């Protein structure tokens, strides 16, 4: 059971990831007064792509071909350790904060260098922008989660979630500021406007995707959808853990599952509302905005020292 449960959780998240992307697309269309493609359109697109031949540039190497599978594999690994219906991590051995952040860094690293491996200047520029965005957002996420870890006295995600679940009043200010910083970082990591647009594979920001086609592109799209879901679930599971089970029961599992679905759907709709109220930023303006998120993380750190 201890091995089966995290595997089932990862596979379920993998299966529903395109559905959450579909809900986002429908919400965006409704906010634009359009009908939209339907919540299952992501599945149709991916299935169609998986049935086609994957063709890459002549100059591309093994990194370009391997990256889609690395993206999916890394995100599935992270998904096994996230608290979804329980307060504790289903796989405590993998549920260390530093380990999870390194896994996210591996996925970003491969995504960036896959753009450099094509020999195309267009994808290379997109890869450099992706790397720069990572430099801006990862310190914010790391510092925010580290403050929460210091409050919990452990870097294990189960202990952090349990501490937030019981919410120590004496540490409310650091936790609230850390929550704001991580919410900011989550928004950026999910590839949303004004920083990015996850469906814009023909544009410069998503340049590394422009050379993929067929089954490779389908796997990559599924991996990006899974990354968005995993990033959102990590934030929701750690900082909004209420409704998750402390002890495993059949009735509690059903209730926790319903609450988890509601939290994810509400999160997706709130993010869609925010991103559709803003225009995309120029790259040179992006660092000025991300400083606000890092400011929340730094204030959380200072308030932790002062507490």
From Swiss-Prot:
Name this polypeptide is given: Formate hydrogenlyase subunit 4
Disulfide bridges in this chain: none
GO biological process, one term: anaerobic electron transport chain
Topology relative to the membrane: Multi-pass membrane protein
UniProt topological domain (Cytoplasmic) ranges: 24-67, 115-131, 189-221, 275-284
Organism: Escherichia coli (strain K12)
InterPro entries registered for this protein in UniProt: ComplexI_Subunit1, NADH_UbQ_OxRdtase_su1/FPO, NADH_UbQ_OxRdtase_su1_CS
Compartment(s): Cell inner membrane
Lineage: Bacteria, Pseudomonadati, Pseudomonadota, Gammaproteobacteria, Enterobacterales
Isomerase listed as a keyword: no
Family stated for the protein in its record: Belongs to the complex I subunit 1 family.
Chief localization: membrane
GO MF annotation: an example: oxidoreductase activity
Periplasmic-side positions: 1-2, 89-93, 153-167, 243-253, 306-307
Keyword ATP-binding belongs to the record: no
Record GO cellular component, one term: plasma membrane
Family annotation (PANTHER family): FORMATE HYDROGENLYASE SUBUNIT 4, FORMATE HYDROGENLYASE SUBUNIT 4-RELATED
Transmembrane portions of the chain: 3-23, 68-88, 94-114, 132-152, 168-188, 222-242, 254-274, 285-305
One family name in Pfam for this protein: NADHdh
Gene: hycD
Subunit and interaction comment: FHL comprises of a formate dehydrogenase, unidentified electron carriers and a hydrogenase (isoenzyme 3). In this non-energy conserving pathway molecular hydrogen and carbodioxide from formate are released.
UniProt keyword annotations, A-Z: Cell inner membrane, Cell membrane, Membrane, Oxidoreductase, Transmembrane, Transmembrane helix
